[in-house]
A protein has these predicted regions:
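Boundary at the C-terminal end of the N-terminal hydrophobic targeting segment
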Residues: 19-23
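A conserved hydrophobic secondary-structure block that centers on an alpha-helix together
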Residues: 259-266
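An aromatic/glycine/proline-enriched structural segment found at the starts
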Residues: 201, 205-209, 218, 222-229, ...
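Positively charged n-region of N-terminal signal peptides that target proteins for export
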Residues: 1-5
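Active-site recognition of the HExxH zinc-binding catalytic motif
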Residues: 68-76, 80, 356
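M16 family metallopeptidases and their MPP-like homologs
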Residues: 42, 47-63, 69-73, 85-200, ...
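Bacterial N-terminal signal peptides
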Residues: 7-18
């Protein structure tokens, strides 16, 4: 085991040696099928396993108000099986799903008809003319009965069972603002199973246990709310963004009860089409191996109308914004955010370097100013740190003493203003570039994380953007970062949040 660890460390050390440090050549081979399906392969001859991923270009950006979290919910539903996987008697179950669809359509019609009576009119969610109608109660009872009958005919976790039975490991799924992905690591001779299951999931998913699965999201949301910082971070997201869906969390309490099979089916049928899908394989396969196999399972799918593009766009930055957050459970802090561009914009790679170079420097400045606290600089919104649309860079300072909030904010703002006028020491920038380069080469030797980065860049912009993105980080200078700060770290693009104990006066 010690020898293996030594060899692994040696491999990374060799990868980041100066002789090859700036070589980001990614041997990605691509084939685009007639129906628009994109296949990306990195061939690693001799490897006996294959990392397999399927990315769909859809996520929270594509949701509508009142349905926040619906994309994440769709991911859960797509684990419930298909017409061929997950049923003990599909013909009988099929009839129940048809009845469920009809009952839900009638329920939606009744909810719409009663919209004025049911509308929530209270700021504190405390006033409706009526909470229900007899017709609504009857339809919900019918849906519950049909659900129970259908559930008796379903099998739990059918797709997972098949993957595990044939040597699959690391089965995961993720839905974020811009993508949904499913992935698995399989033995070389079982890769065809991935194609069989994912093609079936893409065309024939059955939304079993719909209402029971809804409660899983409720539990996840409650888990998020148990973390003291969750609501503050969400409030900061809302402060920064007024129009972009990138800042919206995975559903509020009211959203979970609004999800309908009709809306989930609309998302599914709109976005899960071959011309909105990318397959990625890294391991002991070749492009020539994969092309006929992919054609076998996905080739019959028709190219469908292009899914509607995301049109949300933030207004131009025009004013400083501020949030005072009262909490006795969350540590006092100051957080300053600035909107930054999305991947594909030439400025975006520089923010990675700026964050890495400026964090340690800012920590030293804060300490020298007599402020006790910890600095963290990141570009995270909800769970993700890069987007194809504008998001934010977040300068966070968690304090030991709430009485230092004013002093801490002043020190932060002064140093941010200085950053736009005076370049950082060149050695800090060089160190940041080396740090990012090391992180990348650790990614490059791990097929799972490498495949994710390729897929993520494809949905944000293009997989071809990844290599120049890395090269741009390597070329960043202290003057580049000074110009970047001068352009973006301005008052009209600034959102400031402070966390105060509840007893501290205004």
């Amino acid at each position: 085991m010690q020898i293996l660890r030594h060899l692994s460390a040696l491999a990374v050390a060799l990868l980041i040696s100066p002789a090859i440090a700036q070589n980001y050549d990614l041997p990605i081979r691509e084939h685009v099928f007639e129906n628009g399906l994109r296949l990306l392969v990195i061939e690693r001859p001799g490897e006996q396993r294959v990392v397999s991923k399927i990315f769909t270009d859809m996520g929270a950006l594509n949701e509508t108000p009142g349905e926040f979290g619906a994309a994440h919910f769709l991911e859960h539903l797509m684990f419930k099986g298909t017409t061929t996987l997950g049923s003990t008697d599909w013909e009988r179950e099929k009839g129940l799903h048809e009845q469920l669809r009809a009952a839900e359509d009638a329920l939606i019609e009744e909810l719409n008809r009663s919209r004025n009576d049911l509308r929530q009119r209270g700021v504190f969610h405390d006033y409706q003319h009526s909470e229900t109608t007899p017709r609504i109660d009857d339809l919900r009872a019918l849906i519950d009965s049909l659900n129970r009958q259908a559930q008796e005919l379903s099998e739990e976790g059918p797709l997972s069972v098949w993957y595990m039975a044939y040597g699959g490991t690391g089965l995961t799924a993720t839905t974020e603002q811009e993508y949904m992905k499913f992935d698995i690591d399989l033995p070389l001779d079982r890769v065809e199973l991935f194609l069989r299951i994912e093609a079936d999931r893409m065309q024939n998913s059955i939304f079993r246990n719909f209402d029971a699965e809804r409660m899983v999201l409720v539990e996840q949301r409650l888990g998020d709310l148990n973390r003291a910082e969750t609501e503050f971070r969400e409030a900061m997201n809302s402060l920064v963004g007024r129009a972009s869906m990138v800042y919206v969390p995975e559903g509020y309490a009211n959203d979970f009860q609004q999800y309908t099979r009709r809306y989930e089916r609309e998302l599914y049928e709109t976005y899960f089409v071959p011309n909105n899908t990318t397959l990625i394989f890294i391991g002991g396969v070749t492009l020539e191996d994969m092309m006929p196999q992919v054609e076998k399972y996905f080739g019959h799918m028709e190219r469908l109308p292009e899914p509607k593009r995301y049109q949300g766009r933030e207004p131009l930055p025009s004013a400083e914004k501020r949030l005072n957050w009262r909490s006795n459970t969350l540590a006092p802090r100051v957080e300053i955010r600035y909107q930054i561009p999305g991947v594909g914009h030439p400025d975006r790679p520089l923010f990675d370097v700026l964050a890495a170079a400026f964090e340690g420097h800012l920590q030293s400045v804060i300490t020298e100013a007599g402020v006790e606290g910890t600095v963290d600089i990141n570009t995270r919104v909800v769970h993700t740190s890069r987007f194809g649309v504008p998001a934010s860079i977040n300068i966070e300072l968690v304090l030991e003493d709430a009485l230092q909030i004013e002093k801490a904010e002043g020190a932060l703002l002064a140093e941010l203003r200085r950053l736009g006028k005076e370049p950082l020491p060149a050695d800090l920038v060089l160190q940041a570039r080396k740090q990012l380069r090391t992180e990348w080469y650790r990614t490059a030797v791990d097929p799972n994380t490498l495949a994710f980065q390729i897929g993520h860049f494809e949905v944000m912009d293009s997989w071809r953007t990844l290599e120049p993105y890395l090269e741009a980080r390597d070329a960043a200078t202290a003057d580049d970062l000074r110009a970047l700060a001068g352009k973006y770290f301005i008052a009209n693009n600034q959102s400031v949040g402070v966390v105060l104990p509840e007893e501290v006066p205004q």
